[in-house]
Amino acid sequence: MKKLITIVFIGLISFSINAQDKVAKIKFKTDTVDYGTIEKGADGLRIFEFTNTGDAPLIVSKVTSSCGCTVPKWSQEPILPGKTGEIQVKYDTNRVNPIRKTITVISNADTPTVALKIKGEVIDSSKESVLEKKDKSLVEK
């Protein structure tokens, strides 16, 4: 009877050790998306692709942005080992200014917090700068 209890106990310990070895790992194709120079009102949707390189299901529990002008969207479903997922980021391109924002991804991966970045510049080509107006007036004379 003691041998049976010992065998069951050792089996349970080895099972729990094996269960702890499995971990999800998140690997992004890139951690920065460059919008470049885009027009005011242009499509502000960009995608961050990632792969679960671990051996346990990956669950992205929360994605936040450093500004309300950037809205992230992601799947709540677990990403199985070896499979890919995506985080969609929509920037409000009605704001004419440089883009420098951080998107924070929280998951059950071995690195639970990952910072992604978007950068670029939104311009309004319908508005001419003072220098452009001055140059045009000199050419016309």
Protein language model regions, located:
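Bacterial Sec-dependent N-terminal signal peptides
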Residues: 1-23
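Long, low-complexity ectodomains and other extracytoplasmic segments of secretory-pathway proteins
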Residues: 20-42, 49, 110-141
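Short, solvent-exposed loop/turn segments enriched in Ser/Thr/Gly
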Residues: 41-47, 94-102
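Asparagine-centered strand-capping/turn motif at beta-strand->loop junctions
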Residues: 50-54
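Surface-exposed binding patches on compact interaction domains or structured appendages
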Residues: 55-83
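Short strand-edge motifs at loop-to-beta-strand transitions and within beta-strands
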Residues: 83-89
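Beta-strand-rich extracellular modules
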Residues: 92, 106-110
